[in-house]
């Protein structure tokens, strides 16, 4: 169903029927949590549930039953929150360490050696590699939300440089680890945490310690993790497949080289009707285009072509 949101309510686009109003949600919740209809999220297409979140709580409100079905308290100081709608598990960071809060409010600490002194020498669950190559976050839930792939970044060997924060009313300074060209870069590892066993498996990454590990993508069955790995010179990229249970590298699916640069920006988007094939984006012909990748063979068939670029894959 297509929906139309306004600051006051949410309507069905075709019929014009009002599904729920902001005032109704606040009445059922018991306080002024919902402030704008544009911010309401409907995470389940087949259910009458709307996700409402404040700084302290995350709630699922049933607008047909007119009540709160489920709620989760958000831990204090929680940052980089990553909530999975299926399992309702929440990944988050506090300072340099990574945690999971289960749907039953059980708190699980994944890491203990992350920096807590403000240096950010070692951090978990954050965006890495200077936010390049499509990296926008540091946690990646499996399709069922029971396993969490995450980054661990050690930048203790990288000098800190003063920076200016101009987002504040009066600009302030802070320090930031920045690897200058030719100098030692930070080192990144990829781990997978199993919520059920409370254990972490580290991927046995192929390549050098300063390689870029980008665009992590889960297989639909949750058994394989795909990583686009790029050398520091940024001219040699390999798509690798890793076994989630053991961390071992299963195979190299493909390799792209360039005398200029290779710039992976997107993960794999698997076809809903065929788990062996995924849409891959590549600039191998000089323009960003779509390819159908067979993950069993590594063969990539070009789907779009021309002297133009694909800006975005909207969906299926």
Give the predicted meaning of each segment.
Residues 1-316:
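Beta-propeller folds
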């Amino acid at each position: 169903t297509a929906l139309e949101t306004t600051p006051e309510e949410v309507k069905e686009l075709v019929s014009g029927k009002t599904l729920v109003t902001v005032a109704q949600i606040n009445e059922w919740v018991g306080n002024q949590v919902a402030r704008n209809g544009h911010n309401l999220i409907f995470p389940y297409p087949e259910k009458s549930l709307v996700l409402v979140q404040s700084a302290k709580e995350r709630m699922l409100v049933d607008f047909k039953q007119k009540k709160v079905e489920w709620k989760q308290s958000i831990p204090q100081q929680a940052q980089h929150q990553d909530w999975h709608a299926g399992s309702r598990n929440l990944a988050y960071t506090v300072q340099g360490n990574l945690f999971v809060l289960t749907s039953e409010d059980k708190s699980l600490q994944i890491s203990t050696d992350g920096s807590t002194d403000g240096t950010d020498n070692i951090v978990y669950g954050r965006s890495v590699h200077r936010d390049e190559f499509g990296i926008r976050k540091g946690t990646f839930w499996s399709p069922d939300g029971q396993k969490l792939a995450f980054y661990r970044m050690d930048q203790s060997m990288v000098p800190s440089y003063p920076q200016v924060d101009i987002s504040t009313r009066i600009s302030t300074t802070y320090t930031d680890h920045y690897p200058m060209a030719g100098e030692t870069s930070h080192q990144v590892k990829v781990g997978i945490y199993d919520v059920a066993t409370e254990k972490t498996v580290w991927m046995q990454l192929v390549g050098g310690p300063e390689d870029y590990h980008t665009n992590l993508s889960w297989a639909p069955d949750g058994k394989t993790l795909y990583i686009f790995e790029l050398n520091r010179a940024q001219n040699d990229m390999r798509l690798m497949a890793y076994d989630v249970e053991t961390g071992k590298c299963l195979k190299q699916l493909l390799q792209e080289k360039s005398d200029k640069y290779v710039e992976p920006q997107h993960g794999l988007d698997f076809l809903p009707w065929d788990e062996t094939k995924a849409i891959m984006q590549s600039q191998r012909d000089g323009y960003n285009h779509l390819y159908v990748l067979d993950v069993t063979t590594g063969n990539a068939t070009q789907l779009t072509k021309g002297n133009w670029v694909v800006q975005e894959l909207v969906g299926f």
